[in-house]
């Protein structure tokens, strides 16, 4: 039903192209010389693009065109003007009144006004001497040059149409000693057919897919209902890929651990888009130069027990995670599918104080973003990370695959998920198991309450 639905890259293409067509009637721009007092590309616009746009808008990345040079940017100025005025680009969905984030890619009003004024004046190029030095990007990577690259053992054939079940493949690292990973990036070779990829670390002796042979693609039955508990998988979430999700580069002194003899388990969700292609995803790792002072672990608050009624416009689902040891909360990542409407993270401290740290009032499932806290939060034992999400299963949701369906947890786009991922920073002498709740408590979804 929804196998042709494409995510992130298509979302970017549709946004940009629709905006471009929308401005065709305004193509009679001023002369390229423009107003003498108008902003210029080299002096005023290029620095904004370097800071906020070029990580995606450059050759080989997810965006459909490059913004590295004036010549590459100039044909798209009309679309740019509308996109920044409507705050469609760069993609950023956090409520500006709640929380502050180190990776906030949204434009300030001054930056928006600069781009709008530049386009209105005819997009003058300006003095080449004003052009800032090119940003330093590693070709083919969003991380520093990888120390190790691990790749799928062979290409996977993604068909022209139909549904592709989640694909898994185990790739041995060959590490003979423990490695501390300071930066990691997953790069598919065919981004347009990838819904998401997760690279898990499977330690020696783990029961996680213990009967599967390395180097061979296989499918796994999806978790259901009370068995859905990604906070307690017998593997470690290393890094993920989804449209709009940048590479993971941890601060100095922090790293994720990959033990000697570990394997990487790739989970790949392909979505056919009308063209048969071959994908051979790779994973780049950059190692810390010395043992870190802090270890980083990706965990989650998750609820897989919900049943969203047909037509419900505002169904509420809650999940929480209780802290056992003192940790630092560094970043958060809400995850839902097409019916996702809004998402909120709160911290409830042992004394009862509640603090809202992220509110996404208009969730956009095409963009799977991490939000890095500008000031990480120390969480004492007994604190809780609480997540609340609402889903719109009504006909008024243009993304809804089928408003007549009762929706439960599932892996495909037409199913739903409710996961609040987060990165915890902690003493490396602790085990990840020390962070997990002592007793599994399955979150219960609450009935829909309009307006809540």
Specify the residue positions occupied by each region the protein language model found.
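N-terminal secretory signal peptides that target proteins for export/translocation
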Residues: 1-13
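Alpha-helical and His/Cys-centered functional microenvironments
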Residues: 9-10, 24, 200
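Bacterial N-terminal signal peptides
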Residues: 14-28
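Aromatic- and Gly/Pro-enriched helix-to-coil junctions and flexible linker segments
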Residues: 29-175, 183, 187, 196, ...
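His-enriched metal-coordination microenvironments in redox/metal-binding proteins
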Residues: 143-433, 440-441, 451
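Long, low-complexity, intrinsically disordered segments
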Residues: 446-452
């Amino acid at each position: 039903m929804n196998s042709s639905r494409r995510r992130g890259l298509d979302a970017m293409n549709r946004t940009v192209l629709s905006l471009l067509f929308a401005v065709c009637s305004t193509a009679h721009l001023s002369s390229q010389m423009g107003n003498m007092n108008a902003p210029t590309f080299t002096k005023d616009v290029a620095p904004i693009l370097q800071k906020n746009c070029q990580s995606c808008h450059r050759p080989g990345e997810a965006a459909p065109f490059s913004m590295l040079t004036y010549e590459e940017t100039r044909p798209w100025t009309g679309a740019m003007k509308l996109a920044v005025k409507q705050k469609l680009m760069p993609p950023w969905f956090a409520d500006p009144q709640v929380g502050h984030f180190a990776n906030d890619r949204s434009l300030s009003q001054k930056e928006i006004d600069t781009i709008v004024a530049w386009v209105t004046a005819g997009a003058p190029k300006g003095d080449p001497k004003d052009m800032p030095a090119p940003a330093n990007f590693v070709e083919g990577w969003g991380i520093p040059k990888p120390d190790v690259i691990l790749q799928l053992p062979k290409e996977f054939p993604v068909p022209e149409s139909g549904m592709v079940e989640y694909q898994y493949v185990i790739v041995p690292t060959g590490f003979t000693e423990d490695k501390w990973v300071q930066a990691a990036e997953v790069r598919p070779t065919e981004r347009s057919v990838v819904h998401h990829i997760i690279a898990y670390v499977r330690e020696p002796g783990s029961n996680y897919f213990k009967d599967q042979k390395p180097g061979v693609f296989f499918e796994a039955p999806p978790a259901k209902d009370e068995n859905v508990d990604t906070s307690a998988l017998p593997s470690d979430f290393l890094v993920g890929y989804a449209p709009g999700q940048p590479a993971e580069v941890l601060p100095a002194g922090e790293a994720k651990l990959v033990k000697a003899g570990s394997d990487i388990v790739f989970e790949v969700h392909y979505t056919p888009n009308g063209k048969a292609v071959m994908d051979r995803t790779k994973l780049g790792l950059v190692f810390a130069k010395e043992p870190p002072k802090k270890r980083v672990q990706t965990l989650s608050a998750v609820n897989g027990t919900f049943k969203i009624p047909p037509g419900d416009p505002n169904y509420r689902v809650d999940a929480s995670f209780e802290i056992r040891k003192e940790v630092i909360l560094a970043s958060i990542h809400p995850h839902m599918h097409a019916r996702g409407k809004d998402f909120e993270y709160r911290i409830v401290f042992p004394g009862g104080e509640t603090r809202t740290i992220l509110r996404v009032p208009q969730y956009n499932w095409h963009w799977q973003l991490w939000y890095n806290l500008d000031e990480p939060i120390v969480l004492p034992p007994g604190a809780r990370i609480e997540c609340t999400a609402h889903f719109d299963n009504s006909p008024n949701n243009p993304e809804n695959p089928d408003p007549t369906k009762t929706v439960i947890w599932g892996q495909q786009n037409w199913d739903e998920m409710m996961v609040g991922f987060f990165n915890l920073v902690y003493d490396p002498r602790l085990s990840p198991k020390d962070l997990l709740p002592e007793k599994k408590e399955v979150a219960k979804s609450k009935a829909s309450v309009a307006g809540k």
